[in-house]
Regions:
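C-terminal and inter-domain tail/linker signature
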Residues: 1-147
Length: 147
């Protein structure tokens, strides 16, 4: 039973990443619980709630409009019960401004990044209740010339 649940959650994960790549915010919202908790690299505190997670995701696309996760196939995909873990190549170009850790805006660098991106997701009833996102933030910032 858990295996079937894990496999169906993995398929939902793939459709979530498809929605990310297409900026299909309706599907993106459907894949997350209303009170989802999301941790990104560099955050002091997790993002709470789908509305806040969607808002930060839309902002990310303003900075990196061509960003893309390669999820067909994933480099790694693991599903067990209510949990999925995926590793994908993640790339994009900084063509929009970005808010720095000090709150100041960083001008577009027009430089590309390419890092591995790992998502660990906890699923309940077909929605992510907790999502942990991992990628080499320092490497990304160095590649776009911010560090």
């Amino acid at each position: 039973m858990a295996e079937t649940n894990g496999l169906s959650n993995m398929e939902l994960m793939r459709t979530l990443d498809d929605s990310w790549n297409a900026q299909d915010w309706k599907t993106f919202e459907k894949r997350h619980a209303t009170n989802t908790v999301v941790s990104w690299p560099g955050q002091a505190d997790p993002t709470r709630g789908i509305n806040n997670h969607k808002a930060e995701s839309v902002e990310f696309f303003k900075t990196f409009p061509d960003n893309h996760l390669i999820n067909h196939p994933y480099k790694v995909e693991i599903a067990q019960g209510e949990w999925t873990c995926t590793v994908a190549d993640f790339s994009g170009t900084m063509t929009g401004p970005m808010k720095g850790p000090d709150g100041k805006m960083i001008a577009p660098a027009n430089k590309k990044f390419h890092v591995e991106f790992c998502t660990v997701a906890h699923w309940k009833d077909g929605e992510i209740v907790e999502e942990k996102l991992f990628y080499d933030l320092v490497g990304l910032l160095k590649q776009i010339g911010v560090m």
